[in-house]
């Protein structure tokens, strides 16, 4: 059985663990570039996401998706895009028949004793999976770190 952790959003990530907590695969959220209002934007690709997860779904998987609310200072269109990405993730999980639960950042971070921001998540992920520390070394790898830790939280729940 596999446990999937998801940090949603076009800049998010997916992590897949074995039931014992071993990191199997971690990757940036599959996305495509679209033109919106004359600007290039990244959007989650449901087709690419489904292709990445199908193998794990076929072998038995559960998923834990971070449920994030509105953030101060974030515009209406940004929140709409984030909500759309969240919905795409849930839809892909449902389409692949992967049982899915949402978890708030406050809940999983408290349970994982994670204090601090994105850097703390990267440091903890590198500590938990030292053989994969390179996956979490860049500042922009915070999504991978959080996805991994969400999945690890899910291992404790499953």
Where are these regions (language model features)?
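Phosphate- and other anionic-substrate recognition elements at nucleic-acid/protein interfaces
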Residues: 1-158
């Amino acid at each position: 059985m596999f446990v999937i952790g998801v940090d949603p959003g076009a800049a998010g990530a997916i992590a897949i663990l074995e039931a014992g907590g071993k990191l199997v695969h971690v990757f940036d959220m599959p996305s495509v570039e679209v033109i919106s209002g004359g600007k290039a934007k990244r959007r989650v690709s449901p087709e690419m996401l489904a292709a990445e997860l199908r193998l794990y779904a076929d072998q038995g998987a559960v998923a834990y998706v971070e449920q994030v609310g509105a953030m101060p200072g974030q515009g209406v269109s940004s929140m709409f895009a984030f909500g759309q990405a969240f919905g795409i993730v849930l839809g892909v999980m449902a389409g692949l028949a992967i049982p899915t639960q949402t978890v708030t950042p406050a809940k999983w971070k408290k349970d994982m004793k994670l204090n601090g921001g994105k850097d703390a998540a990267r440091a903890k992920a590198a500590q938990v999976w030292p053989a994969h520390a390179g996956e979490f070394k860049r500042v922009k790898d915070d999504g991978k770190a959080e996805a991994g830790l969400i999945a690890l939280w899910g291992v404790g729940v499953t």
